[in-house]
């Protein structure tokens, strides 16, 4: 592609992204706490007003997380963050900045890891493609309120999605770097992120290890390698996720559900929901954006050193992995 044209398109895409973000951030000062923001934040608010000690607030947030773990839900790290909602400190305007910033940064990071480090495209091409993906991720969310403005609900999903992208970047980078020190740091950070993400919502909680498991299988089948690093991270993740799933509070909450499908029924329900969601989510604008990306993606696929002997099988697996994100709500809610 003509480099001058690509540069102009990249600058235009970045300008559109910035302009589209400004209104989201500008709404921040007009936001206020709502619903579960008060429920989870009350103990920390009491600690803050009584002591103005950050340490006391962190302790109160942890105590609240463990209380919820025993009485309502096992998502230990999410409940900890919910208890520390910014409104306690009079900073609720930070909510869209935190959530939007995490989403933008994590998407660019994963894009850099895949496009630059793995596929070796130019910086300009990376900037253009990644910016379009960031623009789509931000502007095509199902609900701006639930994605960026309500801390309790948005943090539960948007932030944990962003953390998952960071973790994916680290897992890929581990296999690309030659530095022993970098591998050690990546291992420690990846393990910490795995434990933290596993304590979040069950949608991300189940979807992320499913993708990780298939990455391990792919390396076994296609590369004839045993990915001990990925296996170790998956084991850490699975242990932490089990701690969340088998929380006493989950049994209490599940007792309030009167009609629960079996695993097989939930599996097909998840597939149905994924198809329904895709049908609702893909419109003319989404199609247009992907059409713009087709020349780049086609060239990347052609130049890639990765070979897929059974492309339709990979497409099917990708769809099933996508459906896995709908399984927790189909089975337990």
Model-predicted regions and their roles:
Residues 9-10, 120-131, 182-186, 225-233, ...:
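Membrane-interfacial loop-to-transmembrane alpha-helix junctions, especially the N-terminal start
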Residues 1-22:
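Start-transfer (signal-anchor) and selected internal transmembrane alpha helices
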Residues 28-87, 93, 151, 202-304, ...:
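Transmembrane catalytic cores of multi-pass membrane glycosyltransferases
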Residues 125-172, 284-287, 322-333:
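Membrane-interface micro-motifs in multi-pass membrane enzymes
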Residues 185-202:
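Membrane-interface alpha helices of multi-pass inner-membrane proteins
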Residues 98-124, 128, 166:
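Transmembrane-helix motifs of polytopic, lipid-linked glycan transferases
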């Amino acid at each position: 592609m003509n480099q001058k044209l690509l540069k102009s398109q990249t600058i235009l895409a970045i300008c559109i992204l910035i302009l589209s973000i400004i209104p989201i951030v500008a709404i921040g000062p007009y936001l206020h706490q709502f619903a579960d923001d008060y429920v989870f934040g009350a103990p920390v608010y009491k600690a803050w007003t009584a002591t103005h000690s950050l340490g006391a607030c962190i302790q109160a947030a942890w105590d609240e997380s463990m209380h919820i773990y025993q009485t309502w839900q096992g998502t230990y790290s999410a409940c900890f963050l919910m208890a520390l909602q910014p409104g306690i400190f009079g900073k609720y305007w930070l909510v869209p900045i935190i959530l939007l910033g995490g989403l933008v940064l994590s998407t660019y990071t994963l894009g850099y890891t895949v496009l630059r480090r793995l596929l070796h495209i130019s910086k300009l091409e990376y900037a253009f493609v990644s910016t379009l993906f960031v623009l789509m991720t931000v502007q095509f969310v199902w609900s701006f309120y639930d994605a960026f403005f309500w801390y309790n609900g948005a943090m539960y999903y948007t932030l944990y999605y962003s953390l998952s992208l960071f973790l994916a970047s680290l897992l890929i980078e581990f296999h690309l770097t030659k530095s022993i020190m970098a591998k050690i740091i990546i291992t420690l950070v990846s393990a910490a992120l795995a434990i933290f993400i596993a304590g979040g919502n069950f949608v991300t909680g189940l979807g992320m290890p499913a993708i990780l498991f298939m990455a391990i299988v792919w390396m076994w089948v296609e590369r004839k390698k045993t990915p001990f690093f990925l296996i170790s991270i998956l084991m850490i993740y699975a242990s932490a996720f089990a701690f969340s799933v088998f929380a006493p509070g989950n049994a209490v909450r599940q007792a309030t559900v009167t009609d629960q499908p079996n695993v097989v029924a939930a599996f097909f329900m998840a597939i149905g929901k994924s198809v329904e969601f895709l049908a609702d989510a893909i419109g003319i604008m989404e199609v247009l954006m992907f059409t713009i990306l087709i020349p780049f993606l086609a060239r990347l696929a052609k130049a890639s050193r990765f070979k897929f002997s059974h492309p339709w099988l990979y497409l099917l697996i990708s769809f099933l992995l996508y459906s896995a994100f709908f399984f927790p709500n189909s089975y337990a809610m």
